[in-house]
Amino acid sequence: MPATEILNRADIVKAPQVRPQPQTEKPSLIGLLREDMAKLLVEKGVPERQVKMRVSQLWHWLYVRGVSDFDQMSNVSKDMREMLKEHFTVARPEIVEEQVSGDGTRKWLLRFPPRGAGRPVEIETVYIPEEGRGTLCISSQVGCTLTCSFCHTGTQKLVRNLTAEEILAQLLLARDRLGDFPERDTPQGAIVPAEGRKITNIVMMGMGEPLYNFDNVKTALLIASDGDGLSLSKRRITLSTSGIVPEIYRTGEEIGVMLAISLHAVNDELRDMLVPINKKYPLKELMEACRAYPGLSNARRITFEYVMLKDVNDSLQDAKELVKLLKGIPAKINLIPFNPWPGTNYQCSDWEQIEAFADFINQAGYASPIRTPRGRDILAACGQLKSESERMRKVDRLAFEAMMIANHGED
């Protein structure tokens, strides 16, 4: 199939021109817990007796109304707004590019300040609309340290952790762009849930390993689930980890969100190759941590993610060992057809084999949905994320277009 025909499968929408924010040392009020916001306000002269009220006002404007300009805070005095503008910011990150897949999936390339990285950094955030729900896939790091052999993000070296502000900014910006705040319009032709919120769920499944950035991820998710602000139910927030065992219990105890494990193999020999962190935290330790996860029940199951790699991990014997491995753990098993990317040596399992694998697991009593590939034409599918600052070589990109899907962006 000619590359031009493949390109027509996706509408690649350039983001509107957004002026980069000038370099500034102003701290952001986004991503601060209430007590930390209160301390900053007191330091800038807000009377103690007013602090609680001022924090409530700011919280409402930032997380209920979704404003990104202090001047929009109409019930805050002019003097207070001027003080806030002088000392703080609530600006959104720069949108470098917005791509819209033929299936309605949206991917944003966002640029953040260097903050120790030496130059501005870029990450990707993905929105996946489905009937009755809309899921936002959020990144926690710029790049990744884990080098999972089947994952495109793993080919990009870790640059730095994202701050709590930058993690939350992905959600705020997506809600801006989708018209998911009060008095905002949904883009014409956008595929979103017919009723209610445009973003109903968030998954920490973007770039990076969330549990290697525990404190910032914790703060961001506690704010996202705060009932007086963004108000996302913790049962609609899923954190995915490759298996950082010491932090798994803390995730349940201190954050309380749903847990997903990037499993992908049923024995240590294969998982050492696919997910190298397994050499440090082997399957026995990982399964023990899962069994001890706070709140684990049939109503709060752990999701195990399993990418289907042809002739690697997709045999019926693998399925039998998977059922044995998870025995006694309330679980759902997401089977993920492998999403190809330039330079990979893996292939996706045949569809008949994926269905046979799923049927065996289902008959053993586990829900085993096959994840429908979304956003492949804009490199937004599971395992395909990689920031534009790590652009693929032109020859790889052209080969990939000819092989399957649209390019990620012109050099």
UniProtKB/Swiss-Prot annotation:
InterPro entries for the chain: Aldolase_TIM, Methyltransferase_A, RlmN_N, RNA_MTrfase_RlmN, rRNA_lsu_MTrfase_RlmN/Cfr, rSAM
GO cellular component: cytoplasm
EC class (word): transferase
The organism's place on the tree of life at top rank: Bacteria
EC number: 2.1.1.192
UniProt-annotated location(s): Cytoplasm
Cofactors demanded by this protein: [4Fe-4S] cluster
UniProt binding sites for [4Fe-4S] cluster: 144, 148, 151
Catalytic function, reaction form: adenosine(2503) in 23S rRNA + 2 reduced [2Fe-2S]-[ferredoxin] + 2 S-adenosyl-L-methionine = 2-methyladenosine(2503) in 23S rRNA + 5'-deoxyadenosine + L-methionine + 2 oxidized [2Fe-2S]-[ferredoxin] + S-adenosyl-L-homocysteine; adenosine(37) in tRNA + 2 reduced [2Fe-2S]-[ferredoxin] + 2 S-adenosyl-L-methionine = 2-methyladenosine(37) in tRNA + 5'-deoxyadenosine + L-methionine + 2 oxidized [2Fe-2S]-[ferredoxin] + S-adenosyl-L-homocysteine
Major subcellular site: cytoplasm
Any GO BP: rRNA base methylation
Alphabetical keyword list: 4Fe-4S, Cytoplasm, Disulfide bond, Iron, Iron-sulfur, Metal-binding, Methyltransferase, rRNA processing, S-adenosyl-L-methionine, Transferase, tRNA processing
Record-level Gene Ontology MF annotations: 4 iron, 4 sulfur cluster binding; metal ion binding; rRNA (adenine(2503)-C2-)-methyltransferase activity; rRNA binding; tRNA (adenine(37)-C2)-methyltransferase activity; tRNA binding
Radical SAM core domain: residues covered: 130-379
UniProt cofactor note: Binds 1 [4Fe-4S] cluster. The cluster is coordinated with 3 cysteines and an exchangeable S-adenosyl-L-methionine.
Ligand binding (S-adenosyl-L-methionine): 208-209, 240, 262-264, 339
Active site: 124 (proton acceptor), 382 (s-methylcysteine intermediate)
Disulfide bridges in this chain: 137-382
Coiled-coil parts of chain: none
Note: Reaction proceeds by a ping-pong mechanism involving intermediate methylation of a conserved cysteine residue.
Function: Specifically methylates position 2 of adenine 2503 in 23S rRNA and position 2 of adenine 37 in tRNAs. m2A2503 modification seems to play a crucial role in the proofreading step occurring at the peptidyl transferase center and thus would serve to optimize ribosomal fidelity.
Homology family: Belongs to the radical SAM superfamily. RlmN family.
HAMAP family attached to this UniProt entry: RNA_methyltr_RlmN (MF_01849)
Name the record gives this protein: Dual-specificity RNA methyltransferase RlmN
Annotated gene: rlmN
